[in-house]
Amino acid sequence: MKKNIYKINKNRLYHKLINNKLVYDNKALNRYKIDGNNISTMSTNVKESLLSDLKDKIKSIRNCELKKNATNLVFSDGNPFSKIMIIGEGPGANEDKEGKPFVGRAGKLLDKMLESIKLNRKNVYISNVVNFRPPQNRKPTDEEIGRYLPFLKKHIEIVKPKILLLLGSTALNAIIGNEIVISKARGKWIYKKIGDIETNVIASFHPAFLMRQPDQKKYAWEDLKMI
């Protein structure tokens, strides 16, 4: 199609997207039956070794203000063999202290959100766009996102999720592009090639935003029902 614009009827997603192969008719996926070309045949030892190597590379990053001001590297939580991977923005104070993503108030809300669709941390895998806490819990800058994005994409390639849930505008823009707004893109499926894998991507509001804007929780619930 000209200019890589997917024109679909008004009930479907309509965006200019970069490097995307297909935009779905916006229907819920059955996570129990979903399949794909990137079925992981990777052994437990191989995947754990690749993740450990990636973690070491992030630990050894140099000349990084985020790393210099942080207490801990926040790499991941959950099951790396899950079909579902969740990407947030970056660690907060509690995450920096414990070295795990989503363990503060936003994390407790995320747990409730997952429970509402019969999921928990044992059957999803969670990470962030940046792996060290931005000072004062600010949003990471474009430069910081750009520096950590290759690590994030490699992380996704290793895990090979069938479903990638992006929480918040930072995660959405890092993976899909800056031309898309979370309020317009949320709850809509995109088939996305990331490195050497293809996966089903959906975005929703970040739990921290939902705590500030509780009236938006009903929309997040609609998004989760798509999974």
Language-model features and meaning:
Residues 2, 6, 10-227:
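A polyanion-binding, active-site-adjacent surface
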